[in-house]
From Swiss-Prot:
Residues 158-200, 253-296 form the CUE domain. The gene is SMARCAD1. Its EC number is 3.6.4.12. This is SWI/SNF-related matrix-associated actin-dependent regulator of chromatin subfamily A containing DEAD/H box 1. It is found in: Nucleus; Chromosome. It comes from Bos taurus (Bovine).
Length: 1028
């Protein structure tokens, strides 16, 4: 019994004392040892009703001699539901889908409810006691001692002077062994815990800790679980007799779900499947996903029948595998709660919720259980000798950056650890860590957690390496045999169009991973035709007999392009567009459910797929064969709501298309892998998050461990990702040149920038939130681009005068001038300038053209545009800010340049027409685009110059924008010009972006020493096998 259950036990006893102080003592135990217990006869007469305040999962089998507090017979309820909170008890669930997101139940309980003094808070966190389904049954031999000892705990201040126990009237019922045990401890908590360990384990009735190497445990737990199952069946039968007709219908539905699940997993008992469904609130798809993960783990540990020449060896192995171990592991895998890995200090301060939440941040919190729990026993007080050496070696040799990976180890603590070196022995390490201010022995135990996490990642790497070797071996073998492997262009594709050689390699790679039951990421650089390769793959599946349905999820800006390309390349595929207003999507859903529509492929946008519960429900219930996600880097954050919702899409296979798989850090790449291969990676989510979440550093600052992490990531992603860059596959593609233009600010702009910088610098010390710091950065960026993005020229006096003049306008004659003034105060200079142009009475307040063009970047841009127009070049001009595009329109009109504009406000239906107009009308000189709206999936190869007026914090967004021109179909050399404000924050942004780009180079380049060796790259082998 851990202290959580002990506290709940006391609470129940205390309530029973208040409610039934005159209850009859149990005849089998005379005396005052159990003054609040019911008799055994009364207990048995009640039909095995569980004790009040205990959920069904905590009900245990009672022996004849056990004394259990119960609710009086008249007050007893017919059934106790697992999901109903008992009166006076608040359950707080610390489990959640993401480490960064607190469960809604938890937050509402903590923030909105005020607990009274009689309320017991039970923090619901998986523990070893949950495996034994509640409070353990004590051995009958020592049952009186333990019961008496627990009764003593209800005396006030019992723990202040434990010696007074001998003076109580209960001491006469205590055995000599128990009295000796009381003398050996200083608190009653310690006495009870020691008694449970001493007497409970002696008979096997104590708290059961899961031990992988135990030989006697399977039989004992098997018997316990079988009894538990029989009891649950009796309870279920009792509940059914009292339910209404509606409840009976619900029960029938639940039974049908159980039968449906049993068809998928015939080896599991119905009771086991019912428990899994209860854990997932009777959601069939979620329970199915969890069971698949469990089944996959079992397949990995025990060989399949195909590995043996006869079935006898397999059956003998399966017989040796204890039934209860499967049940235990099933419960661990399918419960959506984190399992404790290792925490030596868990017993200390166990009733502090803050400490529990704090500790849970470093527990293994993956969706389907932690792999640490499978490999290491939890909660052991003794440090194994094997880990002593590893910890000593790590703390002795690790760099400061590596030490900061230890949970709760800051940069300052890591610096202190390095100053304490050397650590010659385990005792010396313990002594130095304990006696140094700011450090504690906790760091040693947390270091073990880190080492375990690294072991998990290493196992995952080895697993991925095995898969990669199998794929390589098969392709090599097929290449040597010749023929039989090459997947030609599918015949149902448009015969007037043909795939390029590297696109055929991509199609063969997709077919290869599909045949091996894997999912993948097609990560070719932007402009290499990932869309065409995905369509060709769907055509290949169609010819193989897999006619769908498939789902394609795309950004809103590319949905028209996808529909066009599918109809052009493969008109055989019937496409259904799931897009439009809520009413339109409702009608489409009705047609899908009624099967009025015939389709092979559904095309929708990220927003339409998850925007409402009805949308999510459709794709959660609809059985899909393949789900393809275009611009897959939108799934780089595994903690986002979008990520969690899209994970629920019911598809057998997943394929991600992205031109930028690595953006800010390695964790984003791991998030993509977890999305496409959840069965393999979701059990190690927390370990992956911690091992790959550190920030990137410049090459000269990278430690050996940093480089090892990059090598580890490359090894993990190797079987699941295909990445080609243009320089490798398109020798005929014209080159792309980059040019940085440092733009000196105008005199007035520089003065305004420095004033803003100094003002923000003074207030920055008072800012604690990151959001406020981001706002500072944004204000500086806006001033570096153009002064009119702030309010400088329209002073408060001018605004008051303008607000009075606005009353003369027919639309504002009855308005309040104070409210008009407030609205004007939050507007920028350019917005106020546009307002003055709209209303006649404030026309005189318009800004002069000199002020509008007074920007350092505008001076440089004007000269560049004039030169390019003379050469006959065409320009695509990007900006992060739509208001900056408004000001750029004034510049282009002033210089009389023809232009088109596309941003986030442009209707989806109009975008494809604007793109076609620019590509066909060569007299249009400039295409204005916002980076976010126009940087994805748009083909603008008719232009050969890309100008980035202001760069993005994420350099891959800029790369996406650049490749609107530098892609298949481009015939001219592409020039990319980046305008950087000299002496501004943009110079620092440029340096950081270059560091992020370096990470991609590290991930995609070939390691030194690999050249000249046998080609191991799958793409290279496929190319060789196809004779390309």
């Amino acid at each position: 019994m851990n202290l959580f259950n002990l506290d709940r036990f006391r609470f129940e006893k205390r309530n029973k004392i208040e409610e039934a102080p005159e209850a009859t003592p149990q005849p089998s135990q005379p005396g005052p040892s159990s003054p609040i217990s019911l008799s055994a006869e009364e207990e048995n007469a009640e039909g095995e009703v569980s004790r009040a305040g205990t959920p069904d999962s905590d009900v245990t089998e009672k022996t004849e001699d056990s004394s259990v507090p119960e609710t009086p017979e008249n007050d007893r309820k017919a059934s106790i539901s697992y999901f109903k909170n008992q009166r006076g008890i608040q359950y707080i669930d610390l489990s959640s889908d993401s480490e960064d997101v607190v469960s809604p139940n938890c937050s509402s309980t903590v923030q909105e409810k005020k607990f009274n003094k009689d309320t017991v808070i039970i923090v619901s966190e998986p523990s070893e006691d949950e495996e034994s389904q509640g409070l353990p049954t004590m051995a009958t031999r020592n049952n009186n001692d333990i019961t008496n000892l627990k009764n003593l705990s209800f005396f006030p201040n019992y723990s202040d002077n434990l010696s007074t126990v001998r003076q109580t009237r209960y001491s006469e019922n205590l055995s000599s062994d128990l009295l000796k045990l009381i003398d050996s401890t200083s608190t009653m908590d310690g006495a009870i815990a020691a008694a449970l360990l001493m007497f409970g384990d002696a008979e096997g009735g104590g708290p059961r800790k899961r031990k992988l190497s135990s030989s006697s445990e399977p039989f004992e737990e098997d018997e316990f679980n079988d009894d538990q199952s029989m009891k649950k069946k009796r309870l279920d039968h009792g509940e059914e007799s009292n339910e209404s007709a509606e409840s009976s219908t619900n029960w029938e539905k639940q039974e049908s779900i159980v039968l449906k699940l049993q068809k998928e997993f015939p080896n599991f008992d119905k009771e086991e499947l019912r428990e899994v469904l209860k854990e997932h609130e009777w959601m069939y798809t979620e329970a199915l996903e969890s069971l698949k993960v469990f089944a996959e783990d079992q397949d990995m540990q025990y060989a399949s029948p195909s590995e043996f020449p006869n079935g006898k060896e397999v059956s003998s192995r399966s017989q040796n595998y204890p039934k209860n171990a499967a049940k235990t592991k099933l419960k661990q895998k399918c419960s959506m709660k984190p399992q404790n890995g290792f925490n030596k200090k868990r017993k200390k301060n166990v009733f502090n919720p803050k400490r529990v939440i704090e500790d849970s941040e470093y527990d293994s919190g993956s969706d389907v259980g932690s792999s640490l729990d499978e490999d290491y026993s939890s909660g052991e007080e003794v440090m194994e000798d094997g880990y002593k050496g590893k910890i000593l070696h790590f703390l002795q040799d690790a760099s400061i950056g590596e030490l900061t990976l230890i949970p709760q180890c800051s940069q300052k603590k890591a610096q202190k650890i390095t100053e304490l070196r050397p650590f010659n022995s385990w005792e010396a390490l313990f002594t130095k860590m304990s006696k140094t201010n700011g450090l504690s022995e906790d760091l040693i135990w947390h270091c073990k957690t880190l080492i375990q996490e690294r072991d998990v990642v290493i196992k995952l790497m080895n697993k991925c390496e095995d898969i990669s070797n199998k794929l390589t071996k098969q392709v090599t073998m097929l290449t040597g045999n010749g023929g039989g492997w090459n997947t030609e262009q599918p015949s149902i594709l448009n015969q007037s169009l043909s795939l390029k050689p590297y696109q055929k390699v991509g199609l063969n790679w997709l077919a290869l991973v599909h045949k091996h039951g894997l999912n993948g990421i097609l990560a070719d650089e932007m402009g290499l035709g990932k869309t065409i390769q995905a369509i060709a793959f769907l055509a290949y599946l169609y010819q193989e007999g897999n006619k769908g349905p498939h789902l394609i999820v795309v950004p809103a800006s590319t949905i028209d392009n996808w529909l066009r390309e599918v109809n052009l390349w493969c008109p055989t595929l019937k496409v259904l567009c799931y897009y439009g207003s809520q009413e339109e999507r409702k009608q489409i859903r009705y047609n899908i459910h009624s099967r009025y529509e015939e389709y092979n492929v559904i095309v929708t946008t990220y927003n339409c797929a998850i925007s409402s519960s009805d949308d999510r429900s459709l794709f959660r219930r609809l059985k899909l064969n393949y789900a393809i996600f275009d611009e897959g880097h939108m799934l780089k954050n595994m903690g986002s709501i979008r990520y969690q919702h899209l994970m629920t899409i019911n598809a057998n296979n997943r394929l991600l298309l992205t031109g930028t798989p690595v953006q800010n850090n390695l964790l984003e790449l791991m998030s993509l892998l977890n999305f496409v291969m959840p069965h393999m990676f979701s059990s190690s989510t927390s370990e992956i998050r911690r091992m790959f979440s550190s920030k990137t550093k410049p090459a000269d600052e990278q430690s050996i461990y940093e480089k090892e992490r990059i090598a580890h990531a490359k090894q993990i992603i190797k079987p699941f990702i295909l990445r080609r860059v243009k320089e490798e596959v398109l020798k005929q593609l014209p080159p792309k040149k980059d040019r940085i233009e440092l733009c000196a600010m105008s005199e007035k702009q520089e003065q305004l920038y420095m004033n803003l910088f100094n003002r923000l610098k003074k207030s920055i010390n008072n800012m604690e939130k990151n959001t406020e710091m981001c706002n500072v950065m944004m204000q500086l960026r806006k001033m570096a681009n153009h002064p009119l993005l702030h309010r400088q020229y329209y002073t408060a006096e001018k605004l008051k005068e303008m607000s009075q003049l606005m009353l003369k306008e027919p639309t504002h004659c009855e308005a309040n001038p104070d409210l008009i003034f407030e609205d004007m105060e939050v507007m920028t200079d350019f917005e106020l300038h546009v307002l003055c142009k709209q209303y006649r009475h404030i026309n005189n307040f318009q800004l002069d053209m000199d002020l509008i063009l007074d920007s350092g970047k505008f001076r440089v841009l004007g000269c560049i545009l004039s030169e390019l127009k003379q050469k006959g070049d065409r320009v695509v001009l990007f900006s992060q800010f739509t208001m900056m595009l408004d000001i750029l329109e004034v510049l282009l009109k002033h210089h009389q340049h023809r232009y088109l504009r596309l941003d986030g406000k442009t209707q989806i239906s109009e975008r494809i027409h604007l793109i076609d107009e620019f590509n066909t009308d060569m007299d249009i000189f400039v295409f204005l685009l916002s980076t976010k709206a126009g940087g994805l999936g748009i083909n603008l190869t008719s232009a050969n110059v890309v100008i980035l007026h202001d760069i993005d914090c994420n350099p891959y967004n800029d790369k996406q924008a650049e490749d609107r021109c530098h892609r298949v179909g481009q015939t001219k050399e592409v020039l990319v010009i980046k305008l950087i404000g000299q002496g501004t924050i943009e110079e620092s942004m440029l340096k950081i972006n270059q560091q992020k780009l370096k990470l991609e180079q590290d991930m995609t380049t070939v390691d030194e020493g690999d050249e000249g060796s046998m080609p191991a790259d799958i793409a290279t082998l496929l190319k060789t096998s196809m004779g390309l």
